[in-house]
């Protein structure tokens, strides 16, 4: 019987991926529009779709679900391409691996994520530091 469900945030709680995630956003937007954004929106505390919508505003583009979806697909591809760079510029947050490993051994606890990242990117960031093995995603 599961008695506790623990939901973890990823960015800043379990891992820090350096500027790889932000760079993937920049590249995804440029892939779709053929030009870079004039600036990067504040990303902290937002979901990936929210960030995409802010990029659309910066780009002066109309917000369409089709466009949001295209950018999110490119974001997924761009982060996957950069996955091997994440460990070099980022890190697992102190204590994250130890607490997740300990909780994984408790049959009354399930650890998962509640994050603003799209699901594939959540896995990429966690896997970069081997944390995905202790979470039910």
Task: Label the model's feature ranges.
Residues 20, 47, 91-95, 117-118:
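Short beta->alpha linker loops
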Residues 56-98:
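Metal-dependent phosphoesterase signature
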Residues 2, 7, 81-113:
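Short, acidic loop-to-helix structural element flanking the phosphoryl-transfer center
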Residues 40-44, 67-73, 132-137:
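A short, structured active-site edge motif that brings together acidic residues
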Residues 22-26, 48-49, 53, 72, ...:
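An amphipathic alpha-helix signature
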Residues 30-32, 55, 59, 101-112, ...:
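Substrate-recognition/cap helix-loop segment adjacent to the acidic, metal-dependent catalytic center
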Residues 1-44, 56-57:
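Active-site neighborhood of HAD-like aspartate-dependent phosphohydrolases
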């Amino acid at each position: 019987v599961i008695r506790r469900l623990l939901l973890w945030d990823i960015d800043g709680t379990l891992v820090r991926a350096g500027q790889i995630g932000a760079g993937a956003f920049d590249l995804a937007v440029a892939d779709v529009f053929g030009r870079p954004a004039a600036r990067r929106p504040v990303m902290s505390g937002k979901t990936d779709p929210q960030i995409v919508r802010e990029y659309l505003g910066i780009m002066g583009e109309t917000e369409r679900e089709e466009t949001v979806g295209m950018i999110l697909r490119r974001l997924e591809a761009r982060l996957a391409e950069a996955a091997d760079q994440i460990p070099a510029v980022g890190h697992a947050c102190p204590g994250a691996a130890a607490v997740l490993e300990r909780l994984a051994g408790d049959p009354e606890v399930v650890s998962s994520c509640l994050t603003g990242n799209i699901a594939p990117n959540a896995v990429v960031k966690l896997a970069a530091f081997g944390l995905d093995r202790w979470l039910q995603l």
